[in-house]
A protein has these predicted regions:
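Conserved H-loop
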Residues: 121-127
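A short, surface-exposed alpha-helical micro-motif characterized by mixed small hydrophobic
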Residues: 134-136
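Helical segment within the ABC ATPase nucleotide-binding domain
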Residues: 108-120
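Catalytic Walker B motif of ABC-type/P-loop ATPase nucleotide-binding domains
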Residues: 94-98
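Q-loop/switch helix immediately C-terminal to the Walker
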Residues: 22, 28-42
Length: 176
């Protein structure tokens, strides 16, 4: 359930945004065409419509890249486009699969700052194998091991035995 303005309701499809670890964008379109298409088909639900170039600037997508085909974008640029449509849609729940995988240092830092800015007013859930990233960005951490979820107390993360437990779980997962 989601609670808005004191009213509890069921989660709807439009409440959820998703960013894949391997960006999935229509590679036959330019960045501008894709963004325009997204804005046009979602015009009724976009709360704060702005000119396309403002959206691109918010994600640090250079003017010379905006009219290139998405197939010519780097992994990081495609990831930015996925994030951008979710920023525009403003879902209540944002699901991110390994959001910093394969990103260069600059884009990864931009994404971390963006994720920090998106925390207010929504639920952001992401998967990661990077413990430091979880520590940096998350209010709560949950470990998935053997199909079971276990809440991780941040205070335990300084405990050597607890770190060993997490590393052992990750090793088992990589051999499964």
């Amino acid at each position: 359930y989601i609670e808005e303005n004191g009213v509890r309701r069921e989660v709807a499809a439009e409440d959820i945004g998703y960013v894949l670890s391997t960006p999935t964008v229509p590679e036959f379109l330019t960045g501008r065409e894709f963004l325009k298409f997204f804005v046009d088909i979602n015009s009724d639900s976009i709360r704060d419509p702005r000119p396309l170039d403002e959206y691109f600037a918010e994600m640090s997508i250079a003017p010379e890249d905006r009219d290139k085909l998405l197939k010519d974008y780097s992994h990081g640029m495609k990831n930015k486009m996925q994030m951008l449509v979710n920023i525009i849609a403003q879902p209540n729940i944002l699901l991110l699969d390994e959001p910093l995988t394969s990103l260069d240092v600059v884009v990864a830092e931009e994404m971390k700052n963006l994720l920090r800015s998106l925390k207010d007013g929504r639920i952001t859930i992401f998967s990661t194998h990077i413990l430091d990233l979880a520590l940096d960005l998350c209010d709560e951490i949950v470990l998935l091991s053997h199909g079971e979820l276990e809440v991780v107390e941040k205070s335990n993360l300084d405990d050597h035995a607890f770190k060993e437990k997490i590393i052992a779980a990750l090793k088992e997962e990589s051999h499964a």
